[in-house]
Structures are given as structure tokens and as C-alpha cells.
Amino acid sequence: MSTNSSIQPVSPESELLSNTTCQLEEDLSISFSIIFMTVGILSNSLAIAILMKAYQRFRQKYKSSFLLLASALVITDFFGHLINGTIAVFVYASDKDWIYFDKSNILCSIFGICMVFSGLCPLFLGSLMAIERCIGVTKPIFHSTKITTKHVKMMLSGVCFFAVFVALLPILGHRDYKIQASRTWCFYKTDEIKDWEDRFYLLLFAFLGLLALGISFVCNAITGISLLKVKFRSQQHRQGRSHHFEMVIQLLGIMCVSCICWSPFLVTMASIGMNIQDFKDSCERTLFTLRMATWNQILDPWVYILLRKAVLRNLYVCTRRCCGVHVISLHVWELSSIKDSLKVAAISDLPVTEKVTQQTST
């Protein structure tokens, strides 16, 4: 009787724990989390500073929409990394004793919501950036006249609100986020799934993530093919494509990083949701795919840091010098963004502005 009475007060909280466990190297996990969070915060902070400076420079120009979305993506990565990393370090510092420091499951719910949001929102933003560039390259006049910064901000808000809604679905459905087998993170229920609703959350998360990656791939492929066709057909607008190529290269970098980092975790969640694999047999593998997914938040900002026009230009010069080729004048990279976009978009507003300037000068 005394044994039963001592267990009963703990049982409500223990129901939130996974019934399986993962063997982890404690010291390695703690140091990994601290170093990982520090590097991620510094990387995203540097990328935010670069993108904000570029956005202020091109605020009324052709790159403003792209830079706005890119800044939102990096800011999302920054706060997701900061919040999730802080909670993870706290959990390790508390010896992963969830029953002691989170009896009401509030911290686990916050952790789970942040995990889902910081996972889906960057993928959505990456696909939205790919769509924006695809329209900008294939339909430049429509993009220049119809898609304004106000519209981009509305789409950005819609994407963020949708990601928040998906993250809040279990709470709205009176379900709890579960402490996973490693006791270091919270997510949807992944072991001993018997309810269709628990499967639905996993499959919805995996489907939305894979759909975002698929949209990014298709749009980036269309954009790249369109630019290559213009390049081989005519050299008339070669000067107007430098910024297009810069943004497309960055998008391709984001897409590759997202696919490599997120695909294993999304496929694993889909497999668990469809009961193809048992979570008990893949606990360590699931934790490994989760760490791969979180690497996306570190690598994303370096795409913008390293794949900028200035860096690519210097890399181009160094490569040609190393190959013993005479360095030609890179006038493609030297035109302003507004002139480039006007040439590509074929908007003939220049005569009107010239008339106005002539009238004012006289």
C-alpha cells in the first residue's frame, strides 16, 4: 500500500514521458548543445546584420522583396535556435528530470511548439522565396507592377501564422506534446501510437515540410532554366542578370542545405506516422536526424554570408588566377540593382523620368 501511494502522485506527469529510452553520452551532449547554440546565435546574428544592411540599401529597389523574406528566414532561425537551445541546455543542466521541474508540462509544450514552428516556418519561407524569384524571372513585368513590399509582408505574415497554427494544433485538440525517449526534447507522440490523431500530427508535419522542399525544388529549377535560356539566346541583357544569378545561387544553397538537413527527419516522422518503422527501434537514429535538422539553422545564415556578390566575385577572380587565366573586367557585377532590374523587366519608364528631370533643370 505504501508503495502504491508513493507512486500515484507522480503518475500523471510520468504519462508524458516516453516509454523508451536512448543511451546518450552525457558530457558530449551537454557540450554539443552549448557549442551548437553559441555558433548558431553568432552565425545568425552576422547574417541578420548583413541582410538588414542590404535591405536598407535596396529598400525601394528590385531586391527588397527577396531581402525581406531572407531576413525573416534568418530571424526565425535565430530565435528558434536561441529558444530551443536555451531550453535544451536547461534540461541537460537539470539532469533531464522533467517530472521535477515541469510537473504541469508547460515547458514541454513550449518546447514542442517552438520545435514545430522553427522547423516548418523556415521551410515555408524558403519555398516562398523560391516562388518570388520564379515570378520575378519568368514574369518580370507582373512582378514589378503587382507584387509590392506590402504584398510580400502579407504573405510573410500568412506563412508565419499558418506555422503557428500547425504548432498549436495539439494544444487546440487537447493533446500534450510528449517528452521524447532521450529526455532532451519534446515533440508529437512518437512511440506506441494507437490514436489516428497522433498519426495525423506526425504525417501533417512531414507532409508540409516535404511539400515546401518540393515547391522550392520546382520553382528553383524553373528559375534556373529560364535564366540559362536567356543567357544562351542573347547577350542583350547579360548585365541585367547578375543580381538574378546571385539570388538564385543563394536560393539553391538554401534548398540544398534544407534538403540535406531536413529530409531524413521528415522521412523518419512520416515512417513513424505510417507505422512503417517502430520508434523503439530507431531512437538513436531519430535523435541523429533531429540534430541534422537543427544544423539547418546554422548553415542557412552562412549561405547569405558566403554566397554574396562580393564574395563570389573575389572567388571568381582567385579561381581564374589559380588557373592561370587572365582576369577579365567583371562589369556584370558592377551595375546597380535598380538598373539591372529595369533592364530585365523591360519597363520603359526612363523617358518619363528624363522628361521630368529636363523640365526641372530648365
From Swiss-Prot:
The keyword Lyase does not apply. Residues 1-31, 91-109, 176-198, 268-285 are extracellular. Pfam families: 7tm_1. Its main location: membrane. Keywords: Cell membrane, Disulfide bond, G-protein coupled receptor, Glycoprotein, Membrane, Receptor, Transducer, Transmembrane, Transmembrane helix. SUPFAM superfamilies: Family A G protein-coupled receptor-like. GO terms for molecular function: prostaglandin F receptor activity. It comes from the Eukaryota. InterPro entries: GPCR_Rhodpsn, GPCR_Rhodpsn_7TM, PglndnF_rcpt, Prostanoid_rcpt, Prostglndn_DP_rcpt. Glycans are attached at residues 4, 19. Belongs to the G-protein coupled receptor 1 family. Receptor for prostaglandin F2-alpha (PGF2-alpha). The activity of this receptor is mediated by G proteins which activate a phosphatidylinositol-calcium second messenger system. Initiates luteolysis in the corpus luteum. This is Prostaglandin F2-alpha receptor. It comes from Bos taurus (Bovine).
